[in-house]
Structures are given as C-alpha cells and as structure tokens.
C-alpha cells in the first residue's frame, strides 16, 4: 500500500501521449468535482516537461473554467509560446471529455544575480508545527471521533496540515474574527529530489486552504457549510527554491469579499522566515439555501 505522498507523486507523473500532449489521472473521489489544486499541479508538470529543466518556474496564472469530473482522465495540451535567452513561456489547456476545464500560463526564468535582495518579514510570530495538533486531531477532540467520511479523507491526505490558531466551531466564536488564517504544511512523506515535483506538489497544496481566509468571518471552517465555493483563478510567484516535504508556513488573508466573490492572498515561508512563494486567488461563494 503506497502512502499518500507516494500517491501524490504518482498523480503528478503524467503520461506523454504525443508531442506536447500529456494525460493525467483523475482519481475516483466522493467529491462532486476534481480538486483544483490537482489540475493546477498536473498542468504545471505538463508545462515543465516541455522545457530544458534548467529554468525553474517563477510565475503562473490560471483560470478554472469548468468543474472536472472525478475518475475521468484529463488531457493537457501544451503550447510553446516562447523560448528566449532568459525566459521560457508555456500555455497549457486542460481538456476533459472534449471540453476545456482549465488553462494556465507559466513562465520559467534562468536564475540571475541582480546585486540586491529584500523581503518583508512574516506578519507575526507563530508556534512551531510540532507544538500544534493536526486538523484530524482537532476534529477528533471536538467531536469525540472523526466521522467515517473525514477519517477516509484524513488517511488519503498527502499533506499534514496544522492550523496556527485553534479551529472555531460556533458562530459566536467567529463573530469578531478577522479574515486571516495561517497553517503549517508539509507532505506526509518524501517526494524525491526532482525540483519540478516539489513545485507542483506545493501548487497542489496552495489551493487547499487559501479560501479559508474568506470564510473565517462567515462560518466555522469545519462542520455544515452554508456556502458552496469554487476557485475561479489562481496566480503564484515562486521566489526561492524549496522542498514541499519540509514544513512551510502558509499565511493567508482576505482583503475583500463582495458580489459573491472573495479574494485571498497567501505568503508561504520556510521555518527561518524566508519568503518562498506568493499566491493570489479569487473564489466564488453561493449560498446553499438558495437565498
């Protein structure tokens, strides 16, 4: 039995079916649609496999156009937009059952030295991940035991996720909450040594909790949901090399939610406080009661 980290690496190992055309698996899940982070991660793998491997990705911009169907393979068609002296650009279209469900543009850059460097420090000091409970442990503590569906999900989860602030369970607790969240994350097992796999694994993870910041002032993160939500777009900037199987802090905030959409921004740091990745995403929120 492979562990969830090995299954993630396998999920990101696309089948090359033609020049610049790849096929990715879409596991059978109980979810209504394919997880967006999976599609983004696989699309970035497809883009990266058409480069020389000497230029790491420095940015991506993507749109989620239609929900993907679990259990149905996804085909990734790569367009070689540019191969310059310093930059490489790829455009990827994800197709499922003849329909475009996602597109992504990624830019790869040959590392250069500019002679200067700076970054803002993390916004706050947080406990180390070893001091914090896992999400599953927090839910077990609150409910006494994990519901069977959540237990299955926890066993399949490729990332260990630990919220910096304890989960809130009632509307009274979230009444004065700021639209901010922070989590420690790392893959639950080794991911190998291919930098592209680590980049694409973190891309997968970046879609897991980012919209939490939008929801925190509205409803408890765990428990019955009042809203259906879906990622609309996703943008990432990769600043420094990293390993997704080592702890990273994902600091998230939502500057605005209006018109049925919420904007979330994320900053990903290593344990020493170095900024690794910046993320921005907009999500769609609709009331489940139809109001």
Q: What are the residue ranges of the model-derived segments?
A:
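Terminal targeting signals and extreme-terminal segments of soluble enzymes
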Residues: 1-291
């Amino acid at each position: 039995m492979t562990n969830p980290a090995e299954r993630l690496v396998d999920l990101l190992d696309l089948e090359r079916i033609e020049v610049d055309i790849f096929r990715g698996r879409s596991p059978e899940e109980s979810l209504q649609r394919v997880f967006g982070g999976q599609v983004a991660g696989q699309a970035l793998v497809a883009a990266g496999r058409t480069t020389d491997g000497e230029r790491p990705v420095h940015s991506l911009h993507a749109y989620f156009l239609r929900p993907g169907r679990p259990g149905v393979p996804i085909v990734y068609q790569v367009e070689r937009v540019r191969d310059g002296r310093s930059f490489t650009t790829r455009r990827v279209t994800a197709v499922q059952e003849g329909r475009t469900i996602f597109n992504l543009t990624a830019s790869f850059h040959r590392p250069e030295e500019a002679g200067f460097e700076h970054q803002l420090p993390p916004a706050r000091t947080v406990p180390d991940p070893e001091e914090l409970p896992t999400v599953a442990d927090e839910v077990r503590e609150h409910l006494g035991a994990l519901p069977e569906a959540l237990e299955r999900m926890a066993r399949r989860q490729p990332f260990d996720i630990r919220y910096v602030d304890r989960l809130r369970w009632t509307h009274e607790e979230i009444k004065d909450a700021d639209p901010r969240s922070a989590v420690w994350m790392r893959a639950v097992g080794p991911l190998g040594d291919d930098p592209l796999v680590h980049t694409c694994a973190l891309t997968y993870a970046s879609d897991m909790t980012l919209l939490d910041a939008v929801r925190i002032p509205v409803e408890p993160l765990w428990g019955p949901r009042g809203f259906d939500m879906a990622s609309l777009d996703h943008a990432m900037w990769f600043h420094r090399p990293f390993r997704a199987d080592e702890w990273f802090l994902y600091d998230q905030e939502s500057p605005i939610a209006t018109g049925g959409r919420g904007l979330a921004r994320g900053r990903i740091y290593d344990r020493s406080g170095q900024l690794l990745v910046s993320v921005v995403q907009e999500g769609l929120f609709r009331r489940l009661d139809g109001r």
